[in-house]
């Protein structure tokens, strides 16, 4: 990937976010250890992160998000998940860095360019589980439905991850994705991050370069986690990223004061709230 200083497209956000994982991993009191993150991010990822950091984008939301997803993954594996599908997997290295069962099937789905880049960087590394990669534009609904059916048919209990994905989708696209996942009976859980309309508005202002790169932040439902209930998914775990970051001792004094406020659980549209939610299939 060539080196320039600004975000060009949505795939560049993976380089940017990997730097935050690298920075956390290099701390003496690191919450997690992603030893592959800096290599995956490369020089370009560092440039993008430095540019955005100058606009006061703190590290802690990404640390809290990563930690929360890790927790949901571990919980679901303990409960019997045998397959994980990571949609728009980007530069996530969990199959390499997490303690996972060797029998676990992990499927990463992303655009061909992203997968080719990632495979080249990690070519000499061995995953800790059964890792597969699928080159697919997730906007192709028929193809993704076929993929879900193929994977779901071979699984007893599947967890789907959409980390840093649905905020870029329209409301209609999120509805369609929720429907496509629900069709597969073996898909029991879905982990995703979610923004309130209040947070979405703030991020749109602070990260305007995303819109300039044709990667605008779009989705922040007024219903909060309840948005998914009519679509067959119930929020069984809600992790407020501010409060998680506070528990992990990653907040400045300024943010610690806000962390003391009551948690809206994403149900107050005007509140600046960001979280990670575990959605569990509502059996009909």
Give the location of each predicted region.
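Conserved beta-strand signature within the Rossmann-like core of class I S-adenosyl-L-methionine
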Residues: 159, 184-197
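Rossmann-like AdoMet
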Residues: 1-85, 89-136, 141-148, 154
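A short SAM/SAH-binding and catalytic strip from SAM-dependent methyltransferases
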Residues: 157-172
